[in-house]
Curated annotation (Swiss-Prot):
Designated name of the protein: Gene 84 protein
Database matches in Pfam families: Phage_Gp84
Gene that specifies this protein: 84
InterPro entries attached to this UniProt entry: Phage_Gp84
């Protein structure tokens, strides 16, 4: 199993979701970000989340 953790920079609040494959989590993140006007970048197993060009959070996928 793998866990995706997304953390908001403003207050450190985070959310987690798990799946059997890493790519499922990344695809879910990309779809959710797109629906909410966010953009993500990918640096290995993590990256940043942007809103209107400003970094507003981070995300990472880890084996659980």
């Amino acid at each position: 199993m793998f866990t995706l953790t997304a953390t908001r920079d403003r207050d450190g609040k985070n959310t987690k979701v798990s799946a059997s494959h890493r790519q499922i989590l990344i695809d879910h993140l990309e779809a959710a970000a797109s629906r909410n006007g966010l953009v993500i970048d990918q640096l290995g197993d993590g990256g940043h989340i942007y809103l209107r060009g400003e970094a507003v959070g981070t995300w990472e996928v880890s084996a659980s």
